[in-house]
Amino acid sequence: MKSRFHLFLGAAMLLVVTACAPASLQTPTTIPPPSPAGSSLRGVFEGITACSAQTRPLSQIPEDTDCELMTWKVILYQDSGTGMPTTYALESAYGASEANTTSPAGGGTPIAMEGNWEIVKGTKTDPEADVYQLYATDSQVAVSFLKVSEDLLHVLNSDRTLMIGNAAWSYTLNRTDNRTPAPLDGPVSPGPEATRPPIPAAPPDSSVLGVFEGRMPCHEVAYEALDIAPFPGCLKLKSRLTLYVDQATGAPSSYMYMGTSTIRVGTWTILDGMEGDPDAVVYQLELEGSKEPVSFLKADENHLFLLDRDLKLLVGNALFSYTLSRIEKQ
């Protein structure tokens, strides 16, 4: 995507807490149905997103219906010869949340859609961004996605701003047809015992730039940031990131990074540009004892995407993404 991305290498208070869920939830992605005649598979994108009274990702969801989360599976097809978009199939379910599950209560209310799709240009803040636009049978736009990368899509509002998730779910869908979910290496575990020291006070002469939350799959970068060793049965990591800036100048100041049993503090800096995107801004969180910072890509003012050590976007699974969503400033 040729948009202006900003790389966040963490400035903050990043609360990362391991959480548990039934091991049966880590299921392989189903094989997509055969492609329509003359078409080939473009990609399968899956995820679980938020849903609220203020945000209805699909118009089929009644305003008076209790909707707290949604499951998504979007299958995109393209012309076998030209690679141009052809048709899609969308499967979703919505409803209230249910404790210790990643599905709407009772399986939720299903939504199934088919139709045509195309690629158009521009979000509200980036005129060069690629947008995947799916149409209903009446030729009205059913839903639009920002193409974050070949493997990541993000649900858009009708004004083409990115939908903002919450501490539990983002609005990012992950490509699943070109990767195999990592199997759990043991029973689901809550992780290290929560023996974290008292939380220190906010740094003096600083203000909060933003607070971001989300739940991510377990990954070596997150383990390193937490300063803990990988442990068997890790299914997801809950993350909370607070960015601090100098109160007078607005320049990056200090960060505090809290894990289940650890707290990190330090400084962060800004670098301009990255490979393939000279307009990107790189924020670096220095980790004591680590040669490399922890990296996040800023898609807009409200979303951060975790990057690997090669500064490539990490791709989640059908349950969790590597996206942090802005919550209220604190």
How should each PLM-predicted stretch be described?
Residues 1-9:
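Bacterial N-terminal signal peptides that target proteins for export
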Residues 12:
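Flanking scaffold residues of small Cys/His-coordinated metal-binding clusters
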Residues 20-116, 122-251, 256, 260-265, ...:
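Lipid interaction determinants
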